[in-house]
Structure formats: structure tokens, C-alpha cells
Amino acid sequence: MSEFSNVTVIKKANIYFEGKVASHTVLFPDGTKKTLGIMQAGDYEFSTANAEVMEILSGTLEWQMKGECCWKTIGAGESFQIPADSVFLMKVPAVADYCCSYIQ
């Protein structure tokens, strides 16, 4: 899906890591939530409250669950799922565009 219809977009950006990661929240009529964002090059650690699906729209990155030994590479058009109440790491070599879906 390349666009969303009939949604509410929160104007104020979610800013993380001194501005290197920024996203906007998109709310759907059924109560679901997504964020659309950009990550600049860097190494990041994120924690989750709910399960999430990270879809990479452009760029590539490596990711792993905290404590795992192996990094996984993912690129544009691919996605990965993160369990609720967990921590994951990302290595982003160049700007990456993403859509994060929050699973209730």
C-alpha cells in the first residue's frame, strides 16, 4: 500500500536520537496506529510496548533483537516483526525510510 486514505496525521513529529530519527503518527478510523519516519545513518536501540511490524520503504539496514548474535539485513519492500516488551537494535548505513505498524 503506497498511500493511506481517511486517516488523521499528528502534525508534531516524534523526534529521537538528537533528531537522527523522526516520524509522524498516522491514526486510522479502526483505532490502529502507524508511524511514517526517516532514520539517518547511525546505530539505534529501540524498545517496544506493543508488537510492531517495521516495513522499510527505502534504503537498507541491519537489525537484531538485543542479545542475539546475528544481524539480519533488510531493504526496501521488506519488513520484520518485533515482539511486545522487547528491545531491538538497528545499524543504518544511510538514510532509510520506514513505516512502523503497532499491533494491538
UniProtKB/Swiss-Prot annotation:
It is an enzyme of class 2 (transferase). It catalyses: a purine D-ribonucleoside + phosphate = a purine nucleobase + alpha-D-ribose 1-phosphate; adenosine + phosphate = alpha-D-ribose 1-phosphate + adenine; cytidine + phosphate = cytosine + alpha-D-ribose 1-phosphate; guanosine + phosphate = alpha-D-ribose 1-phosphate + guanine. One of its GO terms (molecular function) is thymidine phosphorylase activity. Disulfide bonds: none annotated. It holds the Pfam family Ppnp. Keywords: Glycosyltransferase, Transferase. Its EC number is 2.4.2.1, 2.4.2.2. The keyword Lipoprotein does not apply. PANTHER family: PYRIMIDINE/PURINE NUCLEOSIDE PHOSPHORYLASE (PTHR36540), PYRIMIDINE_PURINE NUCLEOSIDE PHOSPHORYLASE (PTHR36540:SF1). Belongs to the nucleoside phosphorylase PpnP family. Catalyzes the phosphorolysis of diverse nucleosides, yielding D-ribose 1-phosphate and the respective free bases. Can use uridine, adenosine, guanosine, cytidine, thymidine, inosine and xanthosine as substrates. Also catalyzes the reverse reactions. This is Pyrimidine/purine nucleoside phosphorylase. The lineage of its organism: Bacteria, Pseudomonadati, Thermodesulfobacteriota, Desulfuromonadia, Desulfuromonadales. The gene is ppnP.
